């Protein structure tokens, strides 16, 4: 079985062409082992590219804990790059994921712009914002972000009574300019900080606009692994035409 490794701003994934249904999807232990950074290949998640009757392909995403999970923005961008490598698409595509249809384009510099699901509800609280951008996200400001204990503080909120057993991804934010924010994200399913989170970057951009921290509809999000751009339209409290833009790079391929 051939495996491909991709990364998008440091968020890394194992890709498998599963159009012939060769991968044992119910083998949680295998997914865990492949994603293990000491005993396997190492990745934040594993993604299967499968056939779909009405779109170019289907995305099936698993966290590194071996469980199928909700939408992954960086993973979606990497899967678009993978589909191009497999000659399934050229420079634009429509595919289906767990949260519905996604459109994407690839520019001349191999930067991928991925349309995310509309956000119709943003829950604003005193010291945090909660919203779903294909995956659930808690967004709050943090002082001294570079030295912040993301793993421990993120786990406290993720496992708190606030979100119950299902949990949430947790984003800690620092504003660096009127249109730029730095974030660090604790991802459920990985149960650790990741170098980047696409749905988290998207959630942060929308949360900052919804709370009046920025007036822009084009926001730069600096993550540990690089830079992402988020753009959207807003009408009252509804956000549409949301696009997550950034690099997605092939790392290597191997056979097991």
UniProtKB/Swiss-Prot annotation:
One of its GO terms (molecular function) is diaminopimelate epimerase activity. It comes from the Bacteria. InterPro entries: DAP_epimerase_AS (IPR018510), DAP_epimerase_DapF (IPR001653). GO terms for cellular component: cytosol. The active site is at residues 72, 197. Pathway: Amino-acid biosynthesis; L-lysine biosynthesis via DAP pathway; DL-2,6-diaminopimelate from LL-2,6-diaminopimelate: step 1/1. The keyword 4Fe-4S does not apply. It is an enzyme of class 5 (isomerase). SUPFAM superfamilies: Diaminopimelate epimerase-like. Its EC number is 5.1.1.7. Substrate binds at residues 11, 63, 73-74, 169, 187-188, 198-199. GO terms for biological process: lysine biosynthetic process via diaminopimelate. Its main location: cytoplasm. It is found in: Cytoplasm. Pfam families: DAP_epimerase. The record marks 137, 187 as: Could be important to modulate the pK values of the two catalytic cysteine residues. Keywords: Amino-acid biosynthesis, Cytoplasm, Isomerase, Lysine biosynthesis. Belongs to the diaminopimelate epimerase family. Catalyzes the stereoinversion of LL-2,6-diaminopimelate (L,L-DAP) to meso-diaminopimelate (meso-DAP), a precursor of L-lysine and an essential component of the bacterial peptidoglycan. PANTHER family: DIAMINOPIMELATE EPIMERASE, DIAMINOPIMELATE EPIMERASE, CHLOROPLASTIC. Homodimer. This is Diaminopimelate epimerase. It comes from Flavobacterium psychrophilum (strain ATCC 49511 / DSM 21280 / CIP 103535 / JIP02/86). The gene is dapF.
């Amino acid at each position: 079985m051939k495996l491909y490794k991709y990364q998008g701003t440091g968020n890394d994934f194992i890709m498998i062409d599963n159009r012939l249904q060769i991968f044992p999807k119910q083998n949680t232990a295998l997914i865990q082992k492949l994603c293990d950074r000491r005993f396997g290949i190492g990745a934040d998640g594993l993604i299967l590219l499968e056939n779909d009757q009405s779109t170019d392909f289907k995305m099936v995403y698993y966290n590194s804990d071996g469980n199928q999970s909700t939408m992954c923005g960086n993973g979606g961008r990497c899967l678009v790059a993978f589909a191009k490598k497999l000659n399934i698409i050229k420079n634009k595509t429509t595919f289906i994921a767990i949260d519905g249809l996604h459109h994407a384009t690839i520019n001349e510099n191999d930067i991928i712009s991925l349309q995310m699901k509309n956000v119709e509800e943003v829950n604003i609280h005193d010291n945090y914002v909660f919203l779903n951008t294909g995956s659930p996200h808690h967004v709050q400001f943090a002082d001294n972000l570079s030295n912040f204990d993301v793993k421990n503080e993120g786990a406290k909120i993720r496992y708190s009574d606030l979100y119950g057993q299902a949990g949430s991804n947790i984003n800690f934010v620092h504003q660096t300019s009127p249109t730029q924010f730095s974030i660090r994200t604790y991802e459920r399913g990985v149960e650790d900080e990741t170098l980047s989170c696409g749905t988290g970057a998207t959630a942060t951009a929308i949360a900052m606009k919804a709370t009046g921290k920025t007036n822009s509809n084009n926001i730069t999000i600096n993550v540990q692994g690089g830079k992402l751009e988020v753009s959207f339209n807003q009408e009252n409290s509804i956000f549409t035409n949301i696009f997550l833009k950034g690099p997605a790079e092939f790392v290597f391929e191997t056979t097991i």
